[in-house]
Regions:
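Short, well-ordered alpha-helical microsegments
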Residues: 113, 139-141
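Domain-scale segment recognizer with a strong primary affinity
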Residues: 3-9, 21, 33, 46, ...
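Short catalytic-loop micro-motif centered on adjacent basic/acidic residues
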Residues: 102, 129-133
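Well-ordered alpha-helical segments embedded in enzymatic catalytic cores
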Residues: 87, 111-118, 168
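RNase H-like DDE catalytic core and adjacent DNA/metal-binding regions
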Residues: 1-96, 105, 121-128, 140, ...
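Short small-residue beta-strand/loop micro-motif enriched in glycine and branched aliphatics
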Residues: 97-102, 155-157
Length: 236
């Protein structure tokens, strides 16, 4: 049983590489607890939750607000193993939790803008607003002009907490990548991006009570809105 659970834990399932509670529905709790105690991948990257308070973000529809950020993988061994790729551009729809990720060799304004243009082509809609921190790649004149031409209002976060939704996604996605790197004893994180993204998009999100792919469906928009606002009320 232990071997079966640990094997299932690292497959391409929505609950793969997640917390124990995600796999409780598939196996008895006591069996999961016992099996994952022996898993080096689970134990090493186990998340230690701490109480945090964030200002609530009110969104009422899909494509109302995007948040973007850049994740750094700049240690020498990671750069060498990934053929020069050092950054990951990430963007999330705050309402549906749909996300897009792009590995980059540099974080110059032109590179980031190309990634963002591809996101707009992929999702088929433009966001009304974009929120980010003050990273130079996101506040350059060229990117600002592009957003203005597309009537996307860009505003910056100056607080220490920055943009909590994309920051939370970044932590989740990095943890998935590092667990896969540990599983395969490899520094080549770029080869696991698609696999990690597939797991994230099909995984049930605690706030909206469904996966991002399900939340993207038009018929689910009222349900997502109800769950999101109910969750905000709990935090107040």
């Amino acid at each position: 049983m232990d071997e079966e659970i640990n094997t299932r834990y690292v497959e391409n399932k929505p609950y793969s590489f997640g917390g124990k509670y995600r796999i409780y529905k598939a196996y008895a709790k006591k069996d999961v607890d016992k099996a994952l105690q022996k898993s080096d991948i689970y134990s090493r990257f186990k998340q230690h939750r701490r109480a945090k308070s964030f200002s609530p973000i009110y969104v009422y529809r899909k494509r109302e607000l995007f948040q973007s950020d850049t994740v750094f993988f700049t240690t020498p061994e990671l750069v060498e193993a990934n053929h020069g790729y050092k950054y990951l551009f990430t963007t999330i729809d705050v309402f549906t939790k749909m996300a897009w990720v792009y590995p980059m060799k540099d974080n110059k304004c032109k590179t980031v803008m190309t990634c963002f243009q591809d996101i707009l082509r992929t999702c088929g809609d433009k966001p009304e607003r974009l929120n980010s921190d003050r990273g130079s790649e996101l506040v350059c004149k060229q990117f600002a002009t592009f957003l203005k031409d597309n009537k996307i209002h860009h505003y910056l976060s100056y607080s220490l907490r920055k943009c909590p939704v994309i920051e939370r996604f970044n932590l989740t996605f990095q943890r998935l990548l590092y667990k896969m790197m540990k599983q395969h004893n490899s520094y080549e994180w770029t080869q696991f991006v698609d696999r990690a993204m597939n797991i994230y998009l099909n995984r049930r999100h605690r706030t909206i009570k469904m996966s991002p792919l399900e939340a993207e469906k038009d018929e689910n928009e009222p349900i997502v809105r109800r769950h999101s606002l109910r969750n905000i009320e709990k935090l107040r």
